[in-house]
Regions:
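Small/polar/charged residue-enriched interaction surfaces, especially the RNA/DNA-contacting tracks
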Residues: 1-161
Length: 161
């Protein structure tokens, strides 16, 4: 696996499962009115760059101010992988990473807010014991006090290699 790049070892490749897990996102209920927006679309002839007659379709989008809870975990990242992941999270905070479909049409813009980070060094017998005995939950002391400083430190490690 030494031939794989850090991005492949972090997010996965055809021969190796990734270390990052992002489960389905849950809607923050008070931000969603319960209705999807329906938008019109037309089929485009890619060779001519023109609309194709009779190829109209509708698609649904989530209203723009809808918020989602997101969770991300990384299993055993090395310092470079952690730095790459931190750089990606920082770009999400800045709103530079569109998500979902039709991003070239202006959909999918998002900003990550309210970041919290838990950092468990499970190579430490004491932290591993706390985690395995059920103390590795909210309020367990594994939450990083300053998530932005943690991201900065991880990103700086990319350039210290």
């Amino acid at each position: 696996f030494e031939a794989l790049c850090h991005t492949c070892t972090l997010f996965g490749s055809p021969i190796l499962a990734g270390k990052v897990r992002i489960p389905d996102l849950d809607v923050v209920e008070h931000t969603y009115g319960g209705e999807m927006e329906v938008r019109d679309g037309v089929g485009i002839d890619r060779d001519r760059g023109k609309a194709v007659d009779g190829v109209k379709f509708d698609y649904e989008v989530v209203p723009g101010d809808t918020a989602f809870h997101v969770s991300l975990s990384a299993e055993n990242p090395d310092p470079v992988e952690l730095g790459l992941l931190a750089a990606g999270v920082r770009e999400l905070q800045r709103g530079n990473v569109p998500v979902g479909g039709k991003t070239t049409r202006g959909l999918g813009s998002c900003v990550l807010e309210g970041l919290s980070v838990d950092n468990a060094d499970l190579s430490s017998p004491a932290e591993l014991s706390e985690y395995l005995t059920g103390r590795g939950e909210e309020g367990d002391g594994m939450e990083v006090d300053d998530p932005d400083a943690f991201l900065d430190d991880c990103i700086k490690q990319l350039f210290a290699q």
